[in-house]
Regions:
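Central helical "cap/lid" subdomain
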Residues: 1-38, 100-103
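Short hydrophobic/aromatic beta-strand or adjacent loop that forms the aromatic wall/cage
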Residues: 23-27, 48, 65
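Flavin-binding catalytic cores
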Residues: 34, 60-65, 70-114
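Short, glycine-/small-residue-rich phosphate/pyrophosphate-handling segment
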Residues: 35-47
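Short, solvent-exposed beta-alpha or beta-beta edge segments that form flexible loop/patches at the rim
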Residues: 47-56
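FAD-binding beta-loop-beta segment adjacent to the flavin cofactor pocket
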Residues: 56-63, 107-136, 140-142
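A conserved FAD-binding loop/helix module that cradles the flavin
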Residues: 128, 133, 138-165
Length: 166
């Protein structure tokens, strides 16, 4: 948003303070289910922040798959690393965490999200400059998740409606 808005935008300095963080998503597809007694795990103290049995979600194909997210901190340090090295490292971490062989996966895919998340923010989900008649909103205002993009857009629409009706 900052690149689209003029320097005189009232919230220009606040927007300059926003910094998106990276994340790696690793998808592992297996011929047979792994022996896990959970569908999702949020982790601390490791370079992996999230592991989910993606195939357990409603409406997903029956093929057994795991979705793995790195921590933002680890990703930030390794955003420009070789993709194969990142895959190998994350696979080794997953294998260590779940105590099972993940190298038998028939599908291994990695996606690098340069702008995946944002550090915890205040409650400001949108930025309106009524003087210049400009506004900014997005996932980057709150938490860097798709839900926050919708909430931020919804909040902006409500606020604009209030302004226009006054």
């Amino acid at each position: 948003s900052l690149q689209l808005l003029p320097d005189y935008f009232f919230h220009h300095d606040a927007l300059k303070q926003k910094k998106m963080l990276g994340c790696y998503s690793l998808m592992l597809g297996f011929d047979e289910p792994l022996d896990l007694d959970w569908d999702a795990a949020q982790l601390t103290g490791t370079d992996i922040s999230w592991i989910a049995v993606n195939s357990s979600k409603p409406g997903r194909p029956d093929d057994y798959s795991l979705l793995v997210h790195s921590t933002n901190e680890w990703a930030e340090e390794h955003l420009d690393d070789d993709v194969d090295a990142v895959k190998a490292y994350l696979c080794s971490q997953v294998a260590e965490i779940i105590g099972q062989n993940v190298y038998s996966a028939h599908h291994i895919d990695l996606h690098r999200w340069r702008y995946a998340n944002i550090p915890k923010q205040d409650n400001n989900t949108l930025f309106i400059d009524s003087e210049s008649k400009l506004a900014a909103c997005g996932d980057w205002c709150k938490k860097g998740r798709i839900e926050e993009a919708f909430r931020s857009g919804f909040d902006l629409a409500k606020e604009m409606n209030n302004i226009l009706l006054d």
